[in-house]
Amino acid sequence: MYTTHMDVKIEESWKRRLAEEFEKPYFKELSGFVHKEYQGEAVYPPPKYIFRAFDLCPFDQTQVVILGQDPYHGPKQANGLCFAVEETLPLPPSLQNIFKEIESDLGKPLVHTTGDLSR
C-alpha cells in the first residue's frame, strides 16, 4: 500500500506505475492540501475511498477509464468510483442516463439495478 499524508490503498500494479508521480513536488503539495481539507471540512468521498478505482482493478485488467466532471457532494453519495453510489441509495440521474445509453447501444436491458459499480 502506498501512503501519502492520507492512508489510501492502491493495488500493487498501479502503485508501481504511479510511484514516480507520487514523488513529484506537485503531488506532494496536492496530497498535503487534500489532507488539510479533510481535517477541517466535510469532504467526499471518505478518505478510505480515495484512489479506490486504483485498488479494485489492477492496471493490466483496465480497459476503460471514465473520469467524472462533477463529483457527488452529499453524505454517503461519493464512494471513490465515478458515477457510482452505495447500493442502498437511489440511482443518480447521471448514472440512470449512462445505463440508458448502454442499453440503447447493446439493444437489450441491463441487469444492473443498483448504483454499486464495484462488481
Where are these regions (language model features)?
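Generic N-terminal amphipathic, Lys/Arg-enriched alpha-helix
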Residues: H5-L18
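A polyanion-binding, active-site-adjacent surface
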Residues: E20-R119
